[in-house]
Amino acid sequence: QKTYPQNLLNQKFNPDKPNQVWSTDFTYISIGYKKYVYLCAILDLYSRKCIAWKLSHRMDAKLACDTLELALNKRKVEGTLLFHSDQGAQFKAREFRKIIDDNNIMHSFSKPGYPYDNAVTEAFFKYLKHRQINRKKYQNIKLVQLDCFEYIENFYNNYNPHTANLGLTPNQKEENYFNAIK
């Protein structure tokens, strides 16, 4: 029987404070006939906030590493961070593992071929594509970058309410948390 890395998240998508559980994945975006760019995004499951995202012409370990490093530079992680991903080679690569290990992060993996284990991130991509990306045809990565910025930074984090946040946006939920602990 084949063994797989452990799923430590077990579909527990509602941590009780920020920077306890982050999830990540990739999606592709067409920029012409058989041409794609790849978006890697990291969400904080407490608020559903997209805390880091990057685009690249390659879906590789460098994109995963760059996105994780961006998230770590933006956020102050205290205590143990659980980082959940699928079992893609990018997330098992030596250079990615080094960032995980150097930052004492616990890495959790979805079961192979089971997207429900990463449902929050999958839903984020679904709505990004439905509301923004699939409405246009892109010729280059710069145009995708502009629309991703518009959706993620201007709309999603600021104006998109979530039932998991009791109707609050990701930024409102985090603001309420940090104001309450002052």
PLM features: residue spans?
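Basic, flexible linker segments flanking DNA-binding modules
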Residues: 1-18, 114, 169-178
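An active-site-proximal beta-strand-loop segment
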Residues: 15-51, 57-58
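Active-site beta-loop-alpha junctions of metal-dependent nucleic acid enzymes
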Residues: 35, 54-77
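Short small-residue beta-strand/loop micro-motif enriched in glycine and branched aliphatics
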Residues: 47-53, 107-110, 134-135
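Short, surface-exposed connector motifs at secondary-structure boundaries
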Residues: 49, 77-81
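C-terminal domain-tail junction helix/linker
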Residues: 101-105, 129-182
